Amino acid sequence: MKITKIETIALRDSKNGYGETVVRVHTDEGATGIGQAESPSLVIDAVIRNSEGLEGLLAGEDPTQVQRLWQKMYNHTGLYGRRGVTIAAIGAVETALWDLAGKALGKPVHELVWRSFTTTKVEAEPRRSVTPYATVYPSGENIAQLKRRVSDAARR
């Protein structure tokens, strides 16, 4: 299986102006992995699809080699700056690569990620629970305002 194309899809909430970018990595076998970045779509698209971008860099590569490809993307982006939107673009592509690897190997992504970043057999055993973490947009001035924002967003 080889990477043939990386597609970006711009999404924007017209009410609050927040932008998202969906990234799809396509392969020669018809498989597609999906990732996402909370960054301006035009900039994410430029990092991925410009003549020196991530799409050309990864074309023909095996998408299941996620860690090697992450390092390749990171090394390649030194001239762009390895912060902000560039890292968001790399992260979106990486997520799509993990999705493809999970599909190719018939394993859940969380298991692949967990096992790839642990060093001993004991550490690699699945855990019954983990501490969740989430990043959210600015929450507002108080809890009531936050509840109202979340409730309004859920109704849309």
Question: What are the residue ranges of the model-derived segments?
Answer:
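A generic structural signal for short
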Residues: 11, 86-87, 137-139
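A broadly conserved amphipathic alpha-helix scaffold signal in soluble, globular proteins
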Residues: 94-102, 114, 134, 151
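Residues at beta-strand starts and edge strands
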Residues: 19-21, 52, 130
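Metal- or metallocofactor-binding catalytic centers and their adjacent structured scaffolds
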Residues: 26-104
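N-terminal amphipathic alpha-helix/helix-capping segment at the start of soluble metabolic enzymes
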Residues: 1-16, 107-130
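Metal-dependent enolase-superfamily TIM-barrel catalytic cores that perform enediolate-based chemistry
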Residues: 119, 125-156
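Structured beta-strand/loop patches that form or line metal/cofactor-binding pockets in enzymes
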Residues: 1-39
